[in-house]
């Protein structure tokens, strides 16, 4: 029992934490949604919940079944064996009155009441209950021979109740109870009140460690659960103390007539007889009320997968279809007055699924996961493009001395040729012929798991499996990972028009210019004010039939239907989200090899992985390429005198000889690190079909599915023929309940038994659970392929996918047909007068507009001098709009206007189609090496240490006698590298190891000392000395050619004298090339500068005269790459050289940079979503411009930027079980598994035969693994941190109040909180006031500098909003500026958890009134604040929307700097934080103000 609790505790805590969020959501949604699918019943004005049972009359019993009332009549027992039966009040059936002295005394005990309704059982296993009452009396046994009449003996002791039987299988879960009204606020938080009920009985509260709140009112009764399966009979217990006399049992059925006995004589009264054996079980009584759900049974064996169920009957007609196409938009109505802001709307219904979003940018690399089990080897990939040559590696250890080669034929010494001009890059040579395939090597170590192949076609229908036992209801699982973005939904209708924007300040009237020509059509302006609703349009045409509606309420259990036709295979579904990593399955049989997939695109280079496990030795590789020339070694000590060679000059290097024979197999080398995953190879031929696999291990039992619809009632079966009567056998042990036999002939009257009270008539029982699985049937033949199934219902709308990278520009499309004319936009406000254009041709005369109002007749004056500009007059009444005249010809385009302020967001446009995939971006710079992981288990021998300093070559010692082979010792720690010994004799060539990963680039070593002279070669004939050619002029430097493959090893050159180090000079202008100087030593590497813009190509310099060839300088250290230089002019073509010998095969290069994008191919199918890119830092918020005049209504814009990911939707219904997956690759026990499971010992005995494969073998060694204890201890610590988080970034609290309750000793300061729970990645840093429990979030930025923000020639004493109206002003933001949306989301949850909010705002002023106007003695010029719900908070008016002032030194305009401190405190937490501020007394050039935004605090 305690073990169960310990296992359940972590899950239980997760359930409790989930419950907090669910309860909050439920409180929001219950008020709106009512009671979901459950339908109550009403009878005689009384309302009953679904599944309620009641008795409207004594002899009638009813049940509410989803709105339908089912009643049944109670039938009474025909005969009561008593003198005067009595019918109790309110009951239907009479019972025997229990009189004293009748042997049935009840000792004052009252009648047994009706069975109460089951309460709500929490998902907590309680302690084991007491034994149940004794079963019903058995039926009467066969009549025995008549015995002598005995005296009645005293009542024997009653036996102790037997132990309870095996718990029955759990019933299907009942439907949810009707939601209760929310209880009053508890002392703690809403979740505490919910947990208080659990705390009273189960003790759960004390385990979880929550502070209980006050108990809410009891909710209405939940529905009745289904009856659990009857448990088996327990063993008979030892006799108990005498119990109270039981009620009289029912009369047993009459036994068969026995043979007549001989009449015996009356005997002496006998001794008390022993208690008789328990009689056979009586016939089953009327069905009782369904019992409370039983305890979860033991986990059964995994059942076989069942066949696909029969096709259901045709569903009810679907709900109303989708709306027809949107009708034409009505004419724009007149502009309505602006309405007050409405309260926040309720949560709308889930929208239709959007279209699949474009792929998002790749995400940040996640933290390195644990080392996975090595997967099976992937198929070899296509060879990658040749990469750039890697940096020169560190010098390797000195190799063994090779065998002496044969002397080559002497060649003639050629004369040195003239240096040729630098040739242009040659074209790449043709691809060489494919080599013959090598012999098959031993199997490699398992590679990483391959990407999942395409879904195979549906296989033939399998044999119907035996039904599995119903599984135990599991605890609620953790929330699954966020699913992949769903496809784009269909285009939604045009959204409602937004609210009317704020009216801008009145502009000065301009001088009336002459009418300009009609300009070209302007760019679309900002969205205008919305018009009032138009008249309702005509009724649309009948829409198409809508999709199938959501499933209706669950019907009552029907009779089993007849099996339907096999369904057609459904359409292929979308790829599901990757599931949670399941437990490692048993090793399945090897499947047939699948067809090779198409080669995928080359992936981006991943971060360097951990070294793989030691692989098996690979096949012998081909001969390696010759290495680069080694640096000269130290001069060796003279060796022993060699045999005299023939003197001769050194001949030229002979051609490379053919590869030698394979040497003997060398010792196994240390394993190289795992190479990069190769690309998938070309598709191989399809393999032959594999043999059918063995029957798989039965899968885990699936979750209990929803009850199916009620089937049609089956026909009654035929009656079987009666069997032959058998001979009476010996009396056996009491059996279980047998089925009722055929009615026997009436026997003689038995002795009347004690009459028991009749039980209540039970309700018709629900369908019983599935029977135990029958024996395994023979394997059936493969069924024929079923007909195609009907398409499934549309899936629920997926989450919107992440925003994909912009695609490449597509080819210019053909010009489309002219679209329908857009809606007439509302009239824009008057723009500034443009500069006078040239007079255009006169347009056609428009229709005359209606006559305007008569003006006042003015007195004609003499034309005076132009006066100064007057103040703006009030606008005259607007005349009625005339009908639009015909379009005039296009005029000259006007000057470009200034940038307008950002308009209000436009209405949501139709989602555009997904853009094409953009060209691949340039390869990113290789990232820095990741941090070192924790030390692993004992690994293979470490990497070779850095080579030590060269030792001198020791004298050659005499060869010692060979020693005997010693035992192999454990690998010791790496010693310091010793001095290099003399070269040993050449060993046999080892097999080529696996290509290692590229090592980190080492610094270039210092040049070595000259090596020892080689043995003199045979003398070749002296060649003729050629004439020395004249030195050619130095050609201009050509552009860098491609990196060539390594050439054959050249002879070592003589050491040159090192040049002196030159001083690092400043970079001068580029001069003409001078004569070639002596090479200087390598300068110190400079820090890499930024890549400059490519310069213009320089003019070709004059060639300098050739300088003498200097001795080669010492190789300097390799510098860091400099900036890209300008591209030089192309050199002249050199003479074509002789064709060289074929070079050695080069190393496989690294992957090259991606080539330029090719022409656009045909539209491919949607690819696999790429990884998310790292999120770029958001740019700084720019200042808002002045509010522009609203322009005409623009065309429908492109789809908007994808919104942030919404909150997780409600959990959908469980999907149907998928087909069984293919068998996984054989796994390897990794070190981590070895730690926990213990090391498998091959000498362990096999499992005993009496244990089946899925049971644990007995552990005779009884090992205890310390790794398990450490894991449990770590898990316990993590759970403790989950229960009481400490406010760190890794373990954020939910609110500061929670933190205060869990850690009352903590001081006030900054802590991390995560109000929406879930991932800790979106936790925010806040200030916690530990004295009050307040959670305070700071503004960002927290102040506005004091200056003149608003200048107006005619201040009109109206509030001017800093964020909306003023240039460079913006509304106040809160939280981290790098992720402002996170703070907004968290504040939404924080408001749900808080009952009060407060905030202070400080207005810093100079010559500007903040609150009280000292001159006018009123509050007309007080600052106005705007809350988060767009509510204006003022100095006067309704007290709920009024702030208080803590300090005010801004009442006088005396040139001093003052400040006014406002405070607003409210229990409507949606009004805070303050997001904008509007001073009234601003506009003058000497008026300045600034703002300090205090943190908003919730408690």
Curated annotation (Swiss-Prot):
Residues 1266-1499 form the Fibrillar collagen NC1 domain. Its main location: secreted. Residues 710-721, 776-787, 1063-1072, 1127-1141 have a biased composition (Basic and acidic residues). Residues 212-227, 322-340, 427-443, 604-626, 694-709, 742-758, 826-841, 1093-1114 have a biased composition (Low complexity). One of its GO terms (molecular function) is metal ion binding. Residues 104-1268 are annotated as: Disordered. Keywords: Calcium, Collagen, Disease variant, Disulfide bond, Ehlers-Danlos syndrome, Extracellular matrix, Glycoprotein, Hydroxylation, Metal-binding, Repeat, Secreted, Signal. SUPFAM superfamilies: FnI-like domain. One of its GO terms (biological process) is negative regulation of endodermal cell differentiation. Residues 1-26 form the signal peptide. Residues 732-741, 894-903 have a biased composition (Gly residues). Residues 1230-1499 form a propeptide. The modification 3-hydroxyproline is found at residues 919, 1156. Residues 39-97 form the VWFC domain. Disulfide bonds join 1296-1328, 1336-1497, 1405-1450. It holds the Pfam family COLFI. Type V collagen is a member of group I collagen (fibrillar forming collagen). It is a minor connective tissue component of nearly ubiquitous distribution. Type V collagen binds to DNA, heparan sulfate, thrombospondin, heparin, and insulin. Type V collagen is a key determinant in the assembly of tissue-specific matrices. Trimers of two alpha 1(V) and one alpha 2(V) chains in most tissues and trimers of one alpha 1(V), one alpha 2(V), and one alpha 3(V) chains in placenta. The C-terminal propeptide, also known as COLFI domain, have crucial roles in tissue growth and repair by controlling both the intracellular assembly of procollagen molecules and the extracellular assembly of collagen fibrils. It binds a calcium ion which is essential for its function. This is Collagen alpha-2(V) chain. It comes from Homo sapiens. The lineage of its organism: Eukaryota, Metazoa, Chordata, Craniata, Vertebrata. The gene is COL5A2.
